[in-house]
Amino acid sequence: MAVLRQLTLLLWKNYTLKKRKVLVTVLELFLPLLFSGILIWLRLKIQSENVPNATVYPDQSIQELPLFFSFPPPGGTWELAYVPSHSDAARTITETVKREFMIKMRVHGFSSEKDFEDYIRYDNHSSSVLAAVVFEHSFNHSQDPLPLAVKYHLRFSYTRRNYMWTQTGNIFLKETEGWHTTSLFPLFPSPGPREPSSPDGGEPGYIREGFLAMQHAVDKAIMRYHANTSAQQLFQKLMVITKRFPFPPYISDPFLIAIQYQLPLLLMLSFTYTSLTIIRAVVQEKEKKLKEYMRMMGLNSWLHWSAWFLMFFLFFLIVVSFMTLLFCVKVKKDIAVLSNSDPSLVLAFLLCFAISSISFSFMVSTFFSKANIAAAVGGFLYFFTYTPYFFVAPRYNWMTLSQKLLSCLLSNVAMAMGAQLIGKFEAKGTGIQWRDLLNPVNVDDNFCFGQVLGMLLLDSALYGLVTWYVEAVFPGQFGVPQPWHFFLMPSYWCGNPRTVVGKEEEGSDPEKALRNEYFEAEPEDLVAGIKIKHLSKVFQVGNKDKMGIRDLTLNLYEGQITVLLGHNGAGKTTTMSLLTGLFPPTSGHAYIHGYEISQDMAQIRKSLGLCPQHDVLFDNLTVAEHLYFYAQLKGLSLQKCPEEVKQMLHILSLEDKRDLRSKFLSGGMKRKLSIGIALIAGSKVLMLDEPTSGMDAVSRRAIWDLLQQQKSDRTVLLTTHFMDEADLLGDRIAILAKGELQCCGSSLFLKQKYGAGYHMTLVKEPHCNPEGISQLVHHHVPNAMLESHAGAELSFILPKESTHRFESLFAKLEKKQKELGIASFGASVTTMEEVFLRVGKLVDTSMDIQAIQLPALQYQHERRASDWALDSNLCGVMDPTNGIGALIEEEEVLVKLNTGLALHCQQFWAMFLKKAAYSWREWKMVAAQVLVPLTCLTLALLAIHYTSEIFDDPLLKLSLNEYGRTVVPFSVPGTSRLAQQLSENLRDMLQAERQEPREVLGDLEEFLVFRASVEGGGFNERCLVATSFKDRGELTVVTALFNNQAYHSPATALAIVDNLLFKLLCGPQASIEISNYPQPRNTLQVAKDHFNEGRKGFDIALNLLIAMAFLASTFSILAVSERAVQAKHVQFVSGVHVATFWFSALLWDLISFLVPSLLLLVVFQAFNVHAFTRDGHMADLLLLLMLYGWAIIPLMYLMSFFFSAASTAYTRLTIFNILSGIATFIMVTIMRIPAVKLEELSRTLDHVFLVLPNHCLGMAVSNFYENYETRRYCTSSELAAHYCKKYNIQYQESFYAWSTPGVGKFVTSMAASGGIYLTLLFLIETNLLWRLRTFICAFRRRWTLAELQNRTSVLPEDQDVAEERSRILVPSLDSMLDTPLIINELSKVYDQRAPLLAVDRISLAVQKGECFGLLGFNGAGKTTTFKMLTGEETITSGDAFVGGYSISSDIGKVRQRMGYCPQFDALLDHMTGREMLVMYARLRGIPERLINACVENTLRGLLLEPHANKLVKTYSGGNKRKLSTGIALIGEPAVIFLDEPSTGMDPVARRLLWDTVARARESGKAIVITSHSMEECEALCTRLAIMVQGQFKCLGSPQHLKSKFGSGYSLQAKVRSEGKQDALEEFKAFVDLTFPGSILEDEHQDMVHYHLPGCDLSWAKVFGILEKAKEKYGVDDYSVSQISLEQVFLSFAHLQPPTTEDGR
């Protein structure tokens, strides 16, 4: 029942998501109906003609050759050839035949058939051969007689001559050639008579070509040879004529041709979009990790697939029902698209195809984890699986059954063949019926409709198996892969028995064994919601075991938040995955509310709430729907859902967003909803993985409040990288390292165990006395330690055990504040971050905790030597002083950076090597660049060779037995003895051949019309010939009737009659077996095939364009990637010139293009394509290809600006290349055919399309080939020259001629295009177009700026900000040169519907050795400021100066003095850390001899040496940020911009980065930094400003801002409660009384957290009061901190309006 409920829920979810994507759903419905509509429109447009009466044809005489043989051939006389020439019998018979006809001809004997074939092929007079009679007997002697069982074949001209004189005059048009001896019926049957207007039956021309006349003459000559006198007498009494079967009333319907050819394509196109949608939808859930989350909530994988399958099946059912209706409904006069087919069978066929399409889409989806890439590749694969049908269709009649079935393993080919069969059955007149399921269309065919349906279902099953297997073995990023042979393992099917280590009773206390000094005592009065006992997890990575967690034992209590901390890889996520049942544990137990995780997961999940690190939200479900969906998934009953959802919305404060889709929610609201999903349905156990990641300070606070409210009756496990979050939320904090639990206890307990004490920070006045301060501090607190002395701040560490001395210290400092030159001072207690770092170091070094002296907030150069030694030990820095600082000092003295030409050459080399590294590392792409063109061309040349090789028609025996068992009606209206005798002999002869003779007593033709009407299309296969014997006076007339629906029935009918006569004359042993074996092609026909080589050139060009479409697109990938990750911008900021950047790329890409081009020449040589390999034309082809490369590569660069994702760029540019090349090429080529009469338009379009390199390449290759073959033929002989003149076939002596078919204009165009596209590229890159636009908009923008500034200037300006502005507005030249960065009234307005003032007149000077922090909420203008300062955005007004150079006018010089670390890592995944630093060192102009030393120093300073030679893509987030910072620092730029440099780093990595930045600052660099981390700003910044709505609202040192804007203190205290129940209450009452207005922030487990307000409270007073209260109230421990910088920051929150999505 639960399964059914889950399935229904998933179907509801899928249906809702589909319903919300209105455009997609409409398109999915519309496209199939559109294509069905096209067929209906064609059905209505194409007029069918009703023929109400039977069509009866006249008799055809076969006594004489057709009239055109009366005219002599070009050679002079007709020749009648025979083989073998040495046989007297053969000669006699041939001479007899010659005398039979009244035309002038001579007999020509050949000793062997090979000689005859050579004569036909190579003798230019061979067109005079009328026919050849070849006897299939070995005459050993000339006198050998002809046996009674005669076998011979007739060989007529390959090209049917009666058509020769009716040609269109265009030799390039393909004539209907050959005798169709490979098939008995046409590929597509017709519902009416084949060639209804031809009494002689038309193609292949047995009567009009004289074949029957010759056949009858030879047969008569054989009879005369064996019975001369009797034969003579018989022929006098008898006449043989032929006649075409009459045809019953019919409807002539040309529409059926459209059905036969277009139905497969239209069906494929109908389902394409839906297939792509399926792929995208399924992969999107995987990409967004929704599938993994639903699995954690207890959803089975098979249910997930089943729900998708059912949903799409039901959708397809609706679509195909409509399609069937449109196909089968009568649109006019009882005519439909499929008039005769059974609608239920059509529906069954379409459903089978739908099922296979769904399965195919599922299969494709398993190979990808990115939805856009999956859809792009899926689209390509979907089309690609249809292309084999293009090869199958023309060869259908030649293919064996197994080949057809094999090709049907591609569902699109199976569908196409099924649609083709439907078309054939419709043309046959019966339509497809259930009774025809196992019957082929005709005797030629060996394939039936039932096999199509079977193959479609088999395909679905196979694709399903592949889906199941691939998902298990390659589950993607978020699953556990099975071994490749998992399906052979019994454990997969039967479950895996688990080894239980150290099984204990559930009730026992798991932590007793582990209790030591770092584990705080367990709370006695609380219930453990989660008990973890000796839990371990080992992962198998290759052949090695990797320990995930080891022997974890921990209790988590109800009503508490337990915070789990640890570095990346410490085991936090593994622990959560085990507790949620995503992986099974290797050993140990965990109990959640008494249920064991290995056995009772279904029960556990009912009360489990999960909030993964990422938002588990469906873009198109509303807030309420999410809560409803997940509540139901957890098992909440349908009746309770509405109330639960309503309550949860209230708790989350999201009532007003109830019906808003999740994609429109802000980041903070999304996290709230994710937490709501975890809370819903009464989840008693919550697991929250970094619930506030990616949120700003305001949103984070809101989540903290929510969790504090909701924890009362729940067990909460939370992980975080924010230590302040752990400090504030964690009732108990557990720290994991290397998979093992290191400590556990309250925040206060851990700080007491691991903390260093208090950090006291003093802000100095200009006349400050640091020595005096230091003496005073050490006098009161002897073991105090100087922490840092940098900028305007001085900081000390005061040990915690000295708190009783703090009152006197602070009192003395307050008293002597002015005397010592102290502007302000404050203190903060040890943070959780320090605890965390210390635990990590303890694990890493196995040192005693007391021996670890942790560098505190300020990571500065003045740290003690022991600190350096420790870091060296930890990080492998052998000589820490020789870091960035040392390098800088050294360089300032010795190093002169390259400039001018040397710098440009160095930068060119750096950029060139970057491209080379990309090709080297992305070898798969390089392989594709080479293999795709080679494969395309090779396949094309193979296909051309295979298809254009016009094989000589094979021999076909003209016998009824070829058609299987047939009915032969005959009538004997004649009463003569001869007629009776002939009819009896006919019966005997047919029965002997196992045919079915049927005597018709009435009129034979009426009988044939009646049977054809009754039997429909089946009649044409069962009845092929008929005979009648009439008397006409003394003469008996034997009529051989033939059913013209079969190609060879005329000759077969005559063969039966002639055999009948022969047997009458010579007895039953006599027989004549005749075959049709067309002649081989002669010179003229081969010449025509040379002209078809023109078509071959077209095919080569077409395939080359397909190959180049894929190859050319690859040149956009790196361009888009570099721009998307901002690496290109950072390279420009690092000093590289636009021309250097693009020309180096172009040079490498042209070299890359040259490789496949040369290999293409090898392929042409291998296939011996003369046009490109003879007469030095290889050089011409290489020139064409390289000019194409020169033109297309800059075009790809230019078009890369339209895309922000490399995969999208690649797929869409490939489509662009295909359309701009193939579509235009085909269009122009078709219009050039004279018969189309659009030659003038084709010339115009050809000139228009010259701007497209793809079109130029296609036309150039095609024209070159055509010109070569035409010229070669037309100059080969006088006869060829005569034909060329006669048919006006043109060629050019010079291949580079401007006129067609020369390639001059295409070559010129490609050469010019490259230059034009590069010019456009530089115009865009140098912002010339933007500058023009800026100039035009300048006046309007100034007015807008003034108006916007008036609007925003409401609040009075802060005094510090005003003073900074006034200093900058009156600058001196010296101060400008000495100050690394001056920002002067900088403003930015974005032109949009409502103009946005992003930055408003900010002014600032950053001095040497200063680190300036830029703080602000999202949308405050920080990033816009950075973009203007680095030249990425234009400046609206104001200016900025770097080293005295203006950003507006000297951006090139400015960039040489600037380092930049963008917010998101602008790194190139294909390079190593060392390679990137070397590249940027070159860009900065560091001399080559010094680069290695410089890079080594940077790596050492960044602690990146162990990772230096690893690819950047393998780096952790922290290492990437370090490398980004290193790039900003290398080359010693005067000003360094760091945009959120420590985002996503764990605390250890963050500290190391701070250290690097601090050392750079101390070396004299000016640093500007933005950050969301207030702690980071306190650690690094000497001054900072808070930005609101584009303006500075305050400015000064961190301590100055805290003293100016902050008020009050933060107090945490732990009270002993042993033996005294109300001790805590007494202490709370004391605080309320002593500190009026104090706010109780949090209370848990004998701990309280207060905010103490008031500016009048001094540090001395606070410590004095608390020291006295310590004994009186049993206070175990307490800590006091000044209000944090974060609280100052939050005090400005109300001034910032809600941000727009662009977050400027």
From Swiss-Prot:
The protein's enzyme class: translocase
Q: Which CDD domains match?
A: ABC_subfamily_A
Q: So what EC number does this one have?
A: 7.6.2.1, 7.6.2.2
What PROSITE patterns does this protein map onto? Answer: ABC_TRANSPORTER_1 (PS00211), ABC_TRANSPORTER_2 (PS50893)
- Gene Ontology molecular function, alphabetical: ABC-type xenobiotic transporter activity; ATP binding; ATP hydrolysis activity; phosphatidylcholine flippase activity; phosphatidylcholine transfer activity
- Chain's role: Catalyzes the ATP-dependent transport of phospholipids such as phosphatidylcholine and phosphoglycerol from the cytoplasm into the lumen side of lamellar bodies, in turn participates in the lamellar bodies biogenesis and homeostasis of pulmonary surfactant. Transports preferentially phosphatidylcholine containing short acyl chains. In addition plays a role as an efflux transporter of miltefosine across macrophage membranes and free cholesterol (FC) through intralumenal vesicles by removing FC from the cell as a component of surfactant and protects cells from free cholesterol toxicity.
Q: What is the name of the protein in this document? A: Phospholipid-transporting ATPase ABCA3
The organism's taxonomy opens as: Eukaryota, Metazoa, Chordata, Craniata, Vertebrata
